Amino acid sequence: FFNDKIVKYIPIQYVLSRYPSYGINYYQHRPVALTNSQFLPYPYYAKPVAVRSPAQILQWQVLPNTVPAKSCQAQPTTMARRPHPRLSFMAIPPKKNQDKTDSPTINTIATVEPTITPITEAIVNTVAAREASSEFIASAPETNTVQVTSTVV
């Protein structure tokens, strides 16, 4: 089946990483009884039936209830995957508007167009008439009223 000249040059690390079934398995495969109970969120490992020798059965019962190594998980096994319990704070509440009927949305805000209104302001110019003479002028300054029209947007 294999060519001996080719096979003996393959490094053992390549075989172990390429084919995980050849890797070292520190945990023996234990059958899992599927339970759909909220009180047992972890897989229940059933006791093995007496198909193997009594020495292996005693060895199975001594093993701790731990998760298998990564080398076991990479293999296609018949073990059931442990379901992840759903936490209540991660639940997404349903949308509130599911029971409402869809109504078309109407834009009630009308667009406001700016109108140009002319504003009339009165500007008062205060001009003091000065004369070339050096005498004191007691008269009030002259006032001129000019109307200015400006457009404000």
UniProtKB/Swiss-Prot annotation:
It is found in: Secreted. Transmembrane segments: none annotated. One of its GO terms (biological process) is lactation. Its main location: secreted. InterPro entries: Casein_kappa. One of its GO terms (cellular component) is extracellular space. Keywords: Glycoprotein, Milk protein, Phosphoprotein, Secreted. Mammary gland specific. Secreted in milk. It comes from the Eukaryota. The modification Phosphoserine is found at residues 133, 150. Glycans are attached at residues 105, 115, 117, 120, 126, 133, 149. The keyword rRNA processing does not apply. The keyword Ion transport does not apply. It holds the Pfam family Casein_kappa. The record marks 89-90 as: Cleavage. Belongs to the kappa-casein family. Kappa-casein stabilizes micelle formation, preventing casein precipitation in milk. PANTHER family: KAPPA CASEIN (PTHR11470), KAPPA-CASEIN (PTHR11470:SF2). This is Kappa-casein. It comes from Giraffa camelopardalis. The lineage of its organism: Eukaryota, Metazoa, Chordata, Craniata, Vertebrata.
